[in-house]
Every structure is written in structure tokens, then in C-alpha cells.
UniProtKB/Swiss-Prot annotation:
Keywords: Carbohydrate metabolism, Cell membrane, Cell wall, Chitin degradation, Chitin-binding, Glycoprotein, Glycosidase, GPI-anchor, Hydrolase, Lipoprotein, Membrane, Polysaccharide degradation, Secreted, Signal. The lineage of its organism: Eukaryota, Fungi, Dikarya, Ascomycota, Pezizomycotina. CDD domains: GH18_hevamine_XipI_class_III. GO terms for biological process: chitin catabolic process; polysaccharide catabolic process. This is Endochitinase A1. It comes from Aspergillus fumigatus. Its main location: membrane. The active site is at E174. Residues 338-568, 680-736, 750-792 are annotated as: Disordered. The cyclic peptide natural product argifin acts as a specific inhibitor. It comes from the Eukaryota.
Length: 825
């Protein structure tokens, strides 16, 4: 499994190699963008294809050790991880995500395209972010360097992105003053100096008011490379006031003066802007024409200080299409047009054999002068390796909508990039799977369809993304749907989506959500000996409606305040089996035909720890009245949605030999839940668990600061005015250990659906969470031990997401009680 992922990344990097561009930190026309918190956001690799972007900040490390379980930092990358976290041997469930293999795969692709990827610390949620002591600041920086920096021989702590190395760290601090951040920056600098062969960067995102309550102290007392000022959501100094001076005073000049008198005097100053009208409070968005006027003025006035534009955020830009191009493309065009000496694109190519998944301190994964990324998909004439196109339905949480996502694991192209490959002949048994649906949502099931017969010579490959049904979502959505087609399917998928409810602007109220049904029909031509037979697999999944949603929303505004709204949990679940069949005709053409049908079925059952999905296979034989038959399940109880008859597509839901039962499950959700199950007469469910070791906490204890943080800096008296505490050498790590368990999220843990590619599988297994059960090795030392395997074996499904909405600083955490399902390859 790991080798296939390495091959995937290597192929993708090789595809980008011919057109990569070199990064120039001294340029005045760079474009930086935040990614990781967008609603329904696409994978990072999608944005790596955009030549307009130079720096991508991944957000966020949003839980700080002094305030986080186990004294570990915690992370949130929206819908891009599978929800797995590290658990200490004391049973403390940390907030550090461990199942982020999509990001782990995509960062090297960005770096191969000449982009710098920084890990952002902070965000608007939770509002208790703070550092309590100098020692804690040093420990925080040390932990992040060990976990996300170059792989060090002595480091035995967690590596959430595997051996992938970020290009630096960004500080987007929104709360509780600036104590300790200068110490963190100076500690990072000491670590950077230990790896002189590779360049690392530090950036900060203060709000525009001078002094910024959180970051002015760090900017004055520690050296940053980039300062991108949030010129939005603050009326007194926003970029909009450059256009309309009656609104306030655009203070770029004042910030230049501040920088020249600080330790960050050589930093490049960026203008931070919202990437769409909905990415900030009303009235702060600038049109491209307005931006061009601002950029031309200040790039010309401060050619040595002006660095470019920062955008919040990538998904907002992607959705803000102007003349067929995202907002970011227009910003890059403006920068290049205004720059009297724009960067020159290099013609050198990145060698296709360059290893990019495991960059190390001693060598850069990608040469610094690499050509630019191409946004144009190109046809491929080579046959795609034999693989079955897989589409799996995913569990749905209240207030979100899931749609089918046909994905092929052999794709080397990022989502939404169609590729026309040559013919391929995968071979496997048709399988269709479906997972439980939580009321109040709409869900679809997608067949895993293929045929043992050879497909026709002209395969059909969809070139556009699959439409998704989007019900009303209080407070926004944090799930998405993508379609990637890069292997030759043996089936033609026809997707039908029922009416789409309108989205709701309500953020905290309970909302009636109508059910919708999406039906996927897969057909595969086959040519068996004897009579012609067509195998058809049809699946459908439906959900009931509910007037309750279960969300916990943490919000913050530009001034750093936050609020939380909680509504009731859902109380009923309906699960139905899905089945596919392959039919084989026997007998001569002129004689009656006997059809043997092998049916592979997945159904939902309840085990002691929650839901489980069981896959079973059985064979039936029958004699139709003609020489041609279609092997489909019998519709014995067609569903009827809330909209009345005809509101849903008829599909087999209770085949012969099955029975429907209603029961109350006490372990399936936060409160007793009424569950409708469709089960075989004699089959029972099974469960499985997995547990792997993971590391404990980085310590951060210490006394509270004796001086207020975030005050206007005077002289050299800042949070790091004394001699910095030297960072501990990684070669002196103790050999004593403690065992930690990697835990899967359960229905009692915050969870939001994710997206991205789903790896092919012939079975679907729901794994209950492993209880915190780490054991002490007998040592008093706290040395983290990495997991015994990476999260690559788990297909990305979900995580807690933090969506940025109107009026916020950077980020909003939306947590939803739901179930988690993991596809095991």
C-alpha cells in the first residue's frame, strides 16, 4: 500500500516537472494563500496546479500545548484528514491529527511545482490559545520542528505528514496577547541554522491596527521573512479605505516604518485581502481593478519592502470565478503587470526520478529553479494499469450532504482534472457498498462496478465532477465531492440527483432537512459463452428527515472573540443493504437457459461498540422465460421520501431473504438512537479493531508571564528580551519509551465529512475506536514513540473541520457528532 502511494506521488511530481517555476523570496510579485479551512475544499494538489500561487499556508495548528489534552498541540485541516488522532499511554486523547495522508501526498507535489508550503499556527478557534511560559514556547517550537521539520535521527516523536517536510511556519495569532511568540520564532531560527543546505521561512499575519495585540511583540523582537497584514474586517485601516478614504486610513506606510525599526526589518510586506465577498465581512472585498490601483501605488513607493498579496482563502478564490479564472489568477496578473522586473521562469526540469515523498535536511526534494505548473490536462495514450474504478458512499452527518465520488487509485492527476487514458481491462467481482445515513442529510451510494468480461474498445470517461445534492446546512458546510477518472472503467455511470434543497443562512437554529436520494446505475457489457447476458448493479440509499441537527460551532470575529452554539443530537438512523450481482448464462442458444447469480452484499449491523458493516456472498440459480436475463435484485419495498410518492428513485432496498428490524442502539451515538436495520435472516455482524503506538506529550509547564503581552513594543523589551533558551538537541533524546495508541473517531467525537480520493476495495469494514489503552514501559521519561504504521492504510473520510465564514479572523471550527467509517484496503 505504501509503495503504491509513493508511486502515485512520484508519477504526479514527474507530470509537474516540465513546467515548474523557481521561488524567489525577494520578489515583489509573490502571491500567498491560506488553505485548509475552506468549505467543501478541494485537495491541496489541485491548487498546486495553479501557476498563480507561490506560497501556501496550511491551516491550522490550532490547539496549543498549555491548553490542549496531554500538553500536545492539536491540528485541524478541515475535510482533508480521516479523523484519527494520537492518544497517550495515559489514555489522553490528543487533538493532533494523525490520518492526513492526502496532505502528506500533496505537499511534495506543491514543492515540486516550485511552491513553498508553510504550516500555520493559530486561527480563530479555539479562543483560549496562549503560551504560559518561555519554556513552554521553546517546547512548542521544538515539538513542531520535530513533527513537521526535517527527519532527525534522534527524533522518535509523531510525524503526522510522514517524512514530508514543510518549508516553514506561519503565525496567525488571533487571541490573548503576544507572550511567547518571539521565543518560538527565535527557537525556530536556531533549528533552521542546523540545516544550512535548505531554506526555511517564517511568516506572520497581524491585523492592520498598529500595534497588533498579538504579533507586534514577536515582529519587533524576532525576524520574520514575510508579514502579510490582514487588511480586512477592521474598518479603521482596511484596504477598502484606500479606495474610499472616508472609511478610514490605509496604513501600509506606517507598517513599513514599524518593520524598519524591528528585528523583521528585512521582511517582505504583503497586502492581505479576502478572495471573495463572502470570505470577509461585507464591504471589505476589492475588485481586481481596485486591487490594481492599490498595488501599483505601493509597489512603486516601496519596491524593496513590498512583497505581494496574501489571500484568505483558496476555496473562496476558486469559487470566485471572474471571466473564467479564479480570483487568485487575477491577483497574480496584477502583480506581474505592476512589477517592473517580474520573476523569470526557468527552463530546467525536475528529474522524474527525484524522490519527493521523503525530503530530508541534507538535500532539497526539488531543485530551487524549476519550471511552472501546467493547468492544461493532456490526453494520455498509454494504458492505465489494471484497476477497478471505485465509488464508495460515505457516512453523512447532520447539516451536510454527501455525493458519490468516482475515483481511481491509479490517477496521477489532481481532482477535477479529466484524463482520457487508453483502454484497460480490470477484473474483479462487482461490488456495491453503502454506509449508514444520519437523518437530516441526503446521501448517495456508489457502486464499485466492474466485470470479468472484456470491455468495449471505447471506454467512457466522465470529464466533469459529479453533481452533489446540498441540503440546508446551518452555519455552512464542510464536506465536498470530487470526481477523478484516470483509469479505464468497464462501466458507464449514470448519476441522478433528486431536487436540491436551498442552503440556509442560519448558523445556530435547528432546521428541517429534506431527504434526497441519488441512484447510481452501473452497466457492463459482457460476452459469455452461449446466450448474451447483461449484468446490472443498482444501488440506492435513503435517509429519513429530522428537525434536529447536531453541531457545535466555535466562531470568532476580527477582534478575537468567540462564541459557541450547540443544538440537539440526531435520534434515528436507517441503514439498508446494498448488493451487486454477476450473472453467468449456461446452456446452448436454442435451449432454455439457467442463470447462476453471485450476489455480494454489504449490510449494517450493531456490535458492542457501535455500527459495523458486514459483507456476505451467496449464489442463486433460476430459469428465466427467455434466453436473455438481467441479474438485478427484486424490489420488494420501494422507498418513499418525505416529498411523497415519486420523490425518490425506486431501487431494491429489501431483497428476498432479508428482513427489516427496528431497535434502539445505546452505543451508536451520544444518546440512545432508534435504528432501522435490514439484515439477512441468518447473518450476524462482526467487528474489528486496530491499535498502533503513538507518542505522548511535549511538556510546557511554567509560571504565568509577569508582564502583559501584545503591548506596543518599546526599545528591545519584548517577550524574548533575555538570552533565548537553547533548543534541546535532538541527538540527546532519551531511549526510554511509553506506548501510545492511535484511535479512530467514534460517534462521541467531533467529526465532519471529508473528501478526496477513495482507494479501491472489495469490502467495507466499519472499525470501532480502539479505547485508550497505552501501557507504560516502566520509564519516567516522556519520549514520544511514532506509530508502527502510517495512516496511509485508511481512506480519507472525515475530520473536524474549521470553516472560515463572514466576519471571522482565520477559521471557525464546526464539530458534529456522527459515526466514522474507514475503508480498509
Amino acid at each position: 500500500m505504501v509503495s503504491s502511494k509513493l508511486s502515485f506521488v512520484a508519477t504526479a511530481v514527474a507530470a509537474l516537472a516540465p513546467l515548474a517555476s523557481a521561488f524567489d523570496a525577494s520578489s515583489r510579485s509573490n502571491l500567498a494563500i491560506y488553505w485548509g479551512q475552506g468549505p467543501n475544499q478541494l485537495r491541496l494538489s489541485h491548487f498546486c496546479q495553479e501557476t498563480s500561487l507561490d506560497i501556501i499556508n496550511i491551516g491550522f495548528i490550532n490547539y496549543f500545548p498549555d491548553m490542549s489534552p496531554g500538553h500536545w498541540p492539536g491540528s485541524n485541516f478541515g475535510n482533508q484528514c480521516d479523523g484519527s488522532v494520537y492518544v497517550t499511554n495515559d489514555g489522553v486523547v490528543t487533538k493532533l491529527l494523525s490520518g492526513c495522508h492526502q496532505i502528506m501526498e500533496d505537499i511534495p507535489i506543491c514543492q515540486a511545482a516550485g511552491k513553498k508550503v508553510l504550516l500555520s499556527i493559530g486561527g480563530a478557534y479555539p479562543p483560549d490559545q496562549s503560551i504560559l511560559s518561555e519554556d513552554s514556547a521553546v517546547a512548542f517550537a521544538t515539538f513542531l520542528w520535530g513533527a513537521f521539520g526535517p527527519v532527525a535521527e534522534g527524533w522518535e516523536g509523531p510525524r503526522p505528514f510522514g517524512d514530508v517536510v514543510v518549508d516553514g511556519f506561519d503565525f496567525d495569532i488571533e487571541h490573548n496577547g503576544g507572550f511567547g511568540y518571539a521565543t518560538m520564532v527565535n527557537t525556530f531560527r536556531q533549528y533552521f541554522n542546523q540545516v544550512p543546505e535548505r531554506k526555511f521561512y517564517l511568516s506572520a499575519a497581524p491585523q492592520c491596527i498598529i500595534p497588533d495585540a498579538q504579533l507586534s511583540d514577536a515582529i519587533f523582537n524576532a525576524a520574520f521573512d514575510f508579514i502579510w497584514i490582514q487588511y480586512y474586517n477592521t474598518a479603521a485601516c482596511s484596504a477598502k479605505s484606500f479606495i474610499d478614504t472616508s472609511l478610514g486610513t490605509f496604513n501600509f506606510d506606517a507598517w513599513v516604518t514599524v518593520l524598519k525599526a524591528s528585528a523583521s526589518k528585512d521582511a517582505k510586506l504583503y497586502v492581505g485581502l479576502p478572495a471573495s465577498e463572502t470570505a470577509a465581512n461585507q464591504g471589505y472585498y476589492l475588485t481586481p481593478d481596485e486591487v490594481e490601483s492599490l498595488v501599483s501605488t505601493y509597489m512603486d513607493r516601496y519596491p524593496d519592502t513590498f512583497g505581494g498579496i496574501m489571500l484568505w482563502e483558496a476555496t473562496a478564490s476558486e469559487n470566485n470565478q471572474i471571466d473564467g479564472a479564479p480570483y487568485a489568477d487575477h491577483m497574480k496578473d496584477i502583480l506581474l503587470h505592476c512589477d517592473p522586473s517580474p520573476p523569470v521562469t526557468s527552463s530546467s526540469a525536475v528529474p522524474s526520478s527525484t524522490p519527493v515523498t521523503t525530503p530530508s535536511p541534507s538535500s532539497s526534494a526539488v531543485p530551487s529553479s524549476t519550471p511552472a505548473v501546467s493547468e492544461t490536462p493532456s490526453p494520455s495514450s498509454s494504458a492505465v494499469p489494471s484497476s477497478t474504478p471505485v465509488a464508495s458512499s460515505t457516512p453523512v452527518v447532520p447539516g451536510t450532504s454527501a455525493s458519490s465520488s468516482p475515483v481511481s487509485s491509479s490517477s496521477a492527476i489532481a481532482p477535477s482534472t479529466p484524463v482520457v487514458p487508453g483502454t484497460s481491462t480490470p477484473s474483479s467481482t462487482p461490488v456495491a457498498s453503502s454506509t449508514p445515513v444520519v437523518p437530516g442529510t441526503s446521501a448517495s451510494s456508489s457502486p464499485v462496478s466492474s466485470s470479468s468480461a472484456v470491455a468495449s474498445s471505447t471506454p467512457v470517461v466522465p470529464g466533469t465532477s459529479v453533481p452533489s445534492s446540498t441540503p440546508a446546512i446551518p452555519g455552512g458546510s464542510s464536506s465536498s465531492s470530487e470526481a477523478v477518472a484516470s483509469s479505464t472503467p468497464l462501466v458507464t455511470l449514470t448519476l441522478t440527483v433528486s431536487p436540491t434543497p436551498a442552503p440556509s443562512s442560519s448558523e445556530s437554529s435547528s432546521t428541517d432537512l429534506s431527504s434526497s436520494t441519488q441512484t447510481d446505475v452501473g452497466t457492463a457489457p459482457s460476452q459469455p459463452a452461449g446466450p448474451s447476458t447483461t449484468a446490472t448493479a443498482t444501488t440506492s440509499s435513503s435517509s429519513s428527515s429530522t428537525d434536529e441537527s447536531s453541531t457545535t460551532v466555535g466562531s470568532g470575529n476580527g477582534n478575537g472573540s468567540g462564541s459557541t452554539t450547540t443544538t440537539a443530537a440526531t435520534d434515528s438512523i436507517t441503514a439498508a443493504p446494498t448488493a451487486t450481482s454477476s450473472a453467468t448464462a449456461t446452456g446452448a442458444t436454442s435451449e432454455p437457459v439457467t442463470i447462476t447469480t453471485i450476489i455480494v452484499t454489504s449490510y449494517i449491523d450493531i456490535c458492542p461498540t457501535g455500527f459495523t458493516t458486514v459483507t456476505t456472498t451467496y449464489t442463486t440459480t433460476y430459469c428465466p422465460g427467455t434466453n436473455t436475463a438481467t441479474a438485478t435484485a427484486t424490489v420488494t419495498n420501494p422507498p418513499s421520501g418525505p416529498g411523497g410518492a415519486g420523490s425518490q428513485t425506486t431501487a431494491p432496498t429489501v431483497p428476498e431473504g432479508w428482513t427489516t428490524t427496528v431497535t434502539v442502539c445505546t452505543q451508536c451515538a451520544a444518546k440512545p438512537t432508534t435504528v432501522t436495520l435490514t439484515l439477512p435472516v441468518t447473518e450476524t455482524g462482526s467487528t474489528s479493531t486496530d491499535a498502533v503506538p503513538a507518542p505522548p506529550a511535549a511538556t510546557g509547564e511554567g509560571s504565568n508571564p509577569t508582564q502583559p503581552s501584545g503591548a506596543s513594543p518599546t526599545g528591545g523589551n519584548g517577550s524574548f528580551s533575555e538570552e533565548p533558551v537553547p533548543p534541546p538537541a535532538v541527538t540527546q533524546v532519551s531511549t526510554s519509551t511509553e506506548i501510545v495508541t492511535l484511535v479512530r473517531p467514534t460517534s462521541s467525537r467531533p467529526l465532519i465529512l471529508g473528501t478526496g480520493t477513495v482507494h479501491p476495495s472489495s469490502t467495507l469494514a466499519v472499525k470501532p475506536s480502539a479505547k485508550p489503552s497505552g501501557q507504560n514501559s516502566g520509564s519516567s521519561s516522556h519520549v514520544p514513540i511514532p506509530p508502527s504504521y502510517t495512516q496511509e492504510a485508511v481512506s480519507p473520510l472525515s475530520t473536524g473541520a474549521a470553516s472560515r465564514v463572514t466576519g471571522l479572523g482565520h477559521g471557525l471550527v464546526l464539530t458534529v457528532l456522527t459515526l466514522s467509517a474507514f475503508f480498509v484496503l
